């Protein structure tokens, strides 16, 4: 069965709501993860802690509708880098349903599947503040907001407004991107401290992004 729409609670109201419920609270951070980097991990961990979620799932996309497929490496590498990145990390796991389904990854289709598979879970879909502005353009957005509670990661000095229910989480600015890391590697520069060392070692070993 589908989840009921959650209103845009404050964090305190959210905690009170969870105390009265036996349902699991699971966050989802989707992305191309090409490659995963430290900012991804900080977002996932801080949202989990600040909202008191049971777990956050990192969900690699198969064919995101907004990403150039030519820039995306094979999914086996992206998945392996995710596995390496969260080894021994509490509260983070991987959801592979979009990779298994193949095709274009629309959030509505994914969340409809997940809510049907896990009717005892409330899902929190994590997006950046810049993506909040684009919610009206998301595929089947009016139906999607009935399946998930959106969580917006607020950037310093960035003011996003939306009529859709969003819980806001404040995080320090981390100006790290996957494209930056790929560019470093292409130019022969080591992106030290921008991503987990195990992930960087894997990239070097496999000769990725050369």
UniProtKB/Swiss-Prot annotation:
Purpose: Catalyzes the reversible adenylation of nicotinate mononucleotide (NaMN) to nicotinic acid adenine dinucleotide (NaAD).
Reactions mediated catalytically: nicotinate beta-D-ribonucleotide + ATP + H(+) = deamido-NAD(+) + diphosphate
Pfam families: CTP_transf_like (PF01467)
UniProt xrefs under CDD domains: NMNAT (cd02165)
Keyword ATP-binding: yes
Organism: Streptococcus pyogenes serotype M3 (strain ATCC BAA-595 / MGAS315)
Keywords: ATP-binding, NAD, Nucleotide-binding, Nucleotidyltransferase, Pyridine nucleotide biosynthesis, Transferase
Single GO molecular function: ATP binding
Similarity remark: Belongs to the NadD family.
Pathway entry: Cofactor biosynthesis; NAD(+) biosynthesis; deamido-NAD(+) from nicotinate D-ribonucleotide: step 1/1
Protein name: Probable nicotinate-nucleotide adenylyltransferase
GO BP terms: NAD biosynthetic process
